[in-house]
Amino acid sequence: MNNAEWANKDYYADLGVSKNASAEDIKKAYRKLARENHPDKNPGDKVAEDRFKKAAEAYDVVGDETKRREYDDLKKLLASGGIRGGFGSGGADFPGGFRSTQGFDASDLFGGAGPGGGFSADGGLGDIFGGIFNRGSSPRQSARPTRGADVETDITLEFREAAKGTTIPVELTGEAPCNTCHGSGSASGQPSKCGQCNGSGFTSENKGAFGFSAPCTNCGGTGEVITDPCVDCRGRGTVRRTRSITVRIPAGVEDGQKVRLAGQGEAGPNGKPAGDLFVRVHVKEDPVFEREGNNIHVTVPVSFSELALGGAISVPTLDKPVKLKLAPGTPDGRTLRVRGRGVETRTAKGDLMVTVQVTVPPTLSDEAAEALRTYAEAEKKSGFDPRANWAGNNR
């Protein structure tokens, strides 16, 4: 669709709502129309298909807060006579007493208005037309990159490395500053001022009664040109090579998290700043520890006697093992907290959560078996019944 045709649309009427309708009413109206006229519900019905498309187009504009505001501003401008003669040839009046008396086609304000940049008429028309219709400059007139490209890479860490933090070498292949010209692109090391824009980076163009500015096509908006290109980089200021950098991974990084290193991406052209490096971290599973937030969980096998009689057990941590005291009668599956032994970040420190789990010996020595039989008799005499309060007794 031609951009100028968009301005002649009545999107509110297409949705069957008033211009003052709330966002919720607009959404409800669109959903109702979309449901009633959906192609799947009306196979072969061209009228329903057209209604469906019109509703979708309308909702795309007035269903978006920013686009709706720009659309409303444009319609108000047209209704007030701010642009007369419609979107064909003829004169045009603009707010602020500014008038075009020459043969002016208002459609020039849209896609064919000339290269991007600021529209000089009062009233913010550049914002209105440029925003809703996405008018922009052509590729050949757009400014050159002002920084290097961002780079992404992946690394894999052990569980402890991610929890405690580490440094790791990373090898990257991409654009790096040319060593011969030190990134300037010029053999002399000093680019020259662009003669076409006089170093400003922009040129002006008059279209009828209106003035437009655009990035200079000679220097790409930089204000500088290379008159003596470096033989090694051919004036780009960068060459492709492999480099190795050391990446510091902060403590507490999680699986899938990205670490940003500013200025460590690809070098910018002709001395422009480098892009950023984003390192995506993958964390291996650990056979002992599991992480939940900043807390670390570990399950420790224990014997029945250790739980029944109490005592101290050795528990692994991210650093070195610690002793954990068990009270007599600690139940199987109990989770105990060791404070401050979890993952430590810049803002918080987690705990170590220790779950004790009874392990039954697969075989017993004669001495151990006799001791257990003696214990079993004593247990009965003491009146202990592990199923005394069990709900299953009533089934």
UniProtKB/Swiss-Prot annotation:
Example GO BP? response to heat
In which ranges do the CXXCXGXG motif repeats occur?
Answer: 178-185, 194-201, 216-223, 230-237
Domain of life from the UniProt record = Bacteria
Supply the InterPro entries for this chain: DnaJ (IPR012724), DnaJ_C (IPR002939), DnaJ_domain (IPR001623), HSP40/DnaJ_pept-bd (IPR008971), HSP_DnaJ_Cys-rich_dom (IPR001305), HSP_DnaJ_Cys-rich_dom_sf (IPR036410), J_dom_sf (IPR036869)
Cell compartments where the protein resides: Cytoplasm
The GO terms this record gives for MF are: ATP binding; heat shock protein binding; unfolded protein binding; zinc ion binding
Residues annotated to bind Zn(2+) 2: C194, C197, C216, C219
| GO CC field | cytoplasm
* A Pfam entry, by short name: DnaJ_CXXCXGXG
Q: Where does Zn(2+) 1 bind?
A: C178, C181, C230, C233
Under the heading Gene3D superfamilies, the entry gives: DnaJ domain (1.10.287.110), Heat shock protein DnaJ, cysteine-rich domain (2.10.230.10), Urease metallochaperone UreE, N-terminal domain (2.60.260.20)
- How and how many cofactors are bound, per the record note? Binds 2 Zn(2+) ions per monomer.
State where it is primarily located: cytoplasm
Record's keyword terms, sorted: Chaperone, Cytoplasm, DNA replication, Metal-binding, Repeat, Stress response, Zinc, Zinc-finger
- Required cofactor(s): Zn(2+)
Where the record annotates domain J, the positions are 10-75
Domains: what does the record tell us? The J domain is necessary and sufficient to stimulate DnaK ATPase activity. Zinc center 1 plays an important role in the autonomous, DnaK-independent chaperone activity of DnaJ. Zinc center 2 is essential for interaction with DnaK and for DnaJ activity.
Entry-linked HAMAP family:
DnaJ (MF_01152)
Q: What is known about its subunit structure?
A: Homodimer.
Q: What does this protein do?
A: Participates actively in the response to hyperosmotic and heat shock by preventing the aggregation of stress-denatured proteins and by disaggregating proteins, also in an autonomous, DnaK-independent fashion. Unfolded proteins bind initially to DnaJ; upon interaction with the DnaJ-bound protein, DnaK hydrolyzes its bound ATP, resulting in the formation of a stable complex. GrpE releases ADP from DnaK; ATP binding to DnaK triggers the release of the substrate protein, thus completing the reaction cycle.
Query: Under which name does UniProt file this protein?
Result: Chaperone protein DnaJ 2
Q: Which organism is it from?
A: Corynebacterium efficiens (strain DSM 44549 / YS-314 / AJ 12310 / JCM 11189 / NBRC 100395)
What gene name is listed for this protein?
Answer: dnaJ2
